[in-house]
A protein has these predicted regions:
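Short acidic DE-rich linear segments
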Residues: 98-105
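Generic structural signal for hydrophobic core residues of well-folded globular domains
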Residues: 11-17, 47, 82-85
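Short, surface-exposed loop/turn segments at secondary-structure junctions
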Residues: 25-30, 59-65
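Short amphipathic alpha-helical interface segments
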Residues: 3-32
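Short amphipathic alpha-helical interaction segments
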Residues: 33-56, 69
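Amphipathic alpha-helical interaction segments
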Residues: 21, 51-55, 85, 89
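Short, amphipathic alpha-helical interaction segments positioned at domain boundaries
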Residues: 62-97
Length: 105
């Protein structure tokens, strides 16, 4: 999966989960996103570093990576990212739809 698509999907799931008492982190599991656990952990760490999410604990050990998403949440900056990129997503879907209909594009 494209890196930015994965980031967008994570943020979108967290935004949708704001209406729930507890976020189900299985919605953004590496298997769901189609990425390795290591890449997924790096996505979460980077997103936390830039302020899009908070509440994530990432620990790297010799045996692998451990990620605690119990308190994961989207931040205001993460919501702004979603808002700014929603137009890009709409354009992408429109282009993809045209490409599916018109052969050779």
């Amino acid at each position: 999966m494209d890196n930015f698509k994965a980031v967008y999907k994570i943020l979108a799931a967290l935004e949708a989960g704001m209406d729930q008492p507890q976020f189900d982190a299985e919605q953004i599991a590496p298997e769901v996103l189609g990425v390795s656990k290591e890449r997924w952990a790096k996505y979460l760490q980077m997103m936390q570093d830039v302020g899009y999410i908070n509440g994530v604990e990432v620990h790297t050990y010799i045996t692998g990576v451990s990620v605690n998403t119990k308190n994961i949440a989207i931040t205001l900056k993460g919501l702004e990212y979603l808002q700014e990129n929603s137009m890009m997503q709409k354009a992408y879907r429109a282009i993809k739809g045209i490409r599916d209909i018109v052969p050779g594009i």
